[in-house]
Amino acid sequence: MNASNSRVATVRVVPGKYRPLICLLTACSVALTISARAGGFLEHTRQGPLKGAREIVFAVRGMGPDNHWYANFGQYSPKRLAGKSLFTNGASLRVLNLETGQQRTLLEDAQGGIRDPQVHYGGKKILFSYRPGDTSHYHLHEINSDGTGLRKLTDGAFDDIEPTYLPGDDIVFVSSRCKRWVNCWLTPVATLHRCNADGGNIRSISINIEHDNTPWPLPDGRLLYTRWEYIDRSQVHYHHLWTANPDGTAPMTYYGNLEPGILMIDSKPIPGSDKVISVFSPGHGQKEHAGALAIIDPNAGPDEKGAARRITKAEDYRDPWALSDNCVLAARGRDLVLLDAAGNEERIPVLAEDEIKAGMFCHEPRPLVPRPREPALADRVRPGEKTGTMVLVDSRHGRNMKGVGVGEIRELLVLESLPKPINFTGGMEPLSYGGTFTLERVLGKVPVESDGSAHFELPAMRSVFFVALDQNGRAVKRMQSFTGVMPGESLGCVGCHEYRTSAPPLAQHPIPLAAMRPPDVIRPVPNQPDVFDFPRDIQPIIDRHCVECHNTEQADGRVILTGDRGPLYSHAYFSLTVNGQLADGRNRARSNYPPRALGSGAAPLLDKLEGGHHDVKANEDELSTVRLWLDTGAPYPGTYAALGTGMIGGYESNEQVIENDSSRPETIAAKAAIDHRCSSCHGKNSLPRSLSDEIGLSFWMPDLNDPRIRRSRHIVFNLTRPDRSLMLLAPLAKSAGGHGTCRQPDQPPGSGQVITNRNDPDYQSILSMCTAGSRRLNEVGRFDMPGFKPRPEWIGEMQRFGLLPMELDPDHDPIDVYSVEQAYWKSLHHHPPPVPQH
């Protein structure tokens, strides 16, 4: 080793070989085979909780094929990727003796997977996730630290990973038993679960519809874990740190969730302090949680940016374990490393050359030593209860509530974020155009007292959030996170997005008015669906009040609001979105908007329907429908069965492979016609040249201010009435029934005659492409078309979940996808155990 100014020293530990170059790392109280150098760790005294430790347990395995931090178990959803696993084969569980350099293998499986070792409090056994080579699922296992006594704790057609012991010897882990898929990818979700020490009595302790990760006990007995969420905001910016009691009660932000960016994961307490060590994985996170190491001091609150300090510049560290406040054990690439709080580093290579060539890496190093148990927190869950209660102290209290008057908030709209039974790509289509990724259910409303307080029951184990409503039922403030209660839990909050370090405000009444009475029961909204579907629920209202002026013949304001279908969406849905009529959260890295900025409180569409647009005036039932649709994220379909189907030029695994028409004969001819008649004015990137051509617009984060969006494929092609496509009407002369809006460069304005009659060969070529697309859409079907059939993958999951019969014949047996999904969501509800009969 070059011992000049290098910050990195190398410890060479090769299996079967030992070089007695020993110095004492007193900061960690362990001896390492290391080339001696002055300073660094040697200046520290023999302190810390691991005095006398001599061994480290770690896992060896390859890296999976997917770059997402969470996508390392299970398989991809699309049928065309059937059999493509998210893991690699070949793994071992090993122990390294830091004094001798010798390694011993506790378990090895050339075709299996081993991950997430955790040492028991007594230091004599190891908990880990193991996938035997002839299987496809990880389950919890234990093994004695001498390699004896391997025993399987859990089983089933699900994956159980990232386990940790609780002080009473129960186990918390994350599991795909939650039966849901990532809202923006094609992989399964895992959330927090708990079981007994023997693997029995498995129960969910999470209400998340997205991923939870890497739970770990804090010194006070709470769990620290990563929670990923996106309620009407960016799907790639909010995966930060939360705490909860080991029974799932009292979920609370620990660090993050307001400011966007960074995946915070693999966090663990630093002995002797209030701080934690964490991986800050850049952006949306890296494969196997790789990132920079950071120390977080939570005492300033969850939103204090300066409370986190990175100790490494490089962003390729994984699985840290704080041995003291100045020594961290971690994995880095193929090696183990030790670092101090200043980022000085000692490398410990442990893999043989043949293992490196085989693509193996080190993972999850843990000191093999006893450690003290955290305090065991008493369970607060009452499994026999169907509900819990929520108390809101003052709905006007918050950090962005300026202008909200006393008594202005009259009710809370209670919404539920609904999990997906399947998903196929990274975008939100066709659920929305750049907006929501999920469906949201209306549970109902509860009253707010004059002092801003509310007290109400919530159904247990459901992911809920609230919209504060005024006297007209319009949104004043919208929650962009979720909460919920465990069975029998009583939960409280101070206000709306209040500072987590603040106390409740002084009030006229020492006790909130709502807390002085029994909790309200959520009142369903009469005459309204609970999950909205644009063609079914909103288009009829648009037809009655808007289409007379906004159709393919008249198109006032160049806005078309007919229910005609484009390649992915109806023309009305697309037009309302891109013309800024919905005020949804979009896919933006932004939270805590000002009052009346989102949903029904800001949507121009609602202003128009309430009487602010010529003589348009919807009735109260219609207005209620539109308000609720807006406040549930303004989705296009009301079913997840629409995902991955009913689209021309749709996306699967971020590739435009669903019915892409670009190479079809009709499209090739139409491209030539569009080039011939349109490119001299519009160029080649301003108008779509096929039903699948995005003309450079993002499919998952479109810029609504981009002028090209008004000429998008979603509006210029009509697959219900191909001859009413704007791509045909705009250049066609008025005398031939067109709009005549396009003209030759040498023609005066208003004299548009690029195409003079419908027999023009170029007109016929474009019409043939639209007709072929219409014909194909009728063949494959869209969710709102008669005889619609969901994808086989959707059917397969519903069969796996026991909601459709295995003998179902999808080609002949009718499927009510709306009813089946209602049954799916209901199957995930908390069902109290039966009362014993005496």
What is each model feature region?
Residues 5-9, 32, 38, 577-580:
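Intrinsically disordered, low-complexity serine/threonine-rich segments
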Residues 1-18:
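N-terminal secretory signal peptides that target proteins for export/translocation
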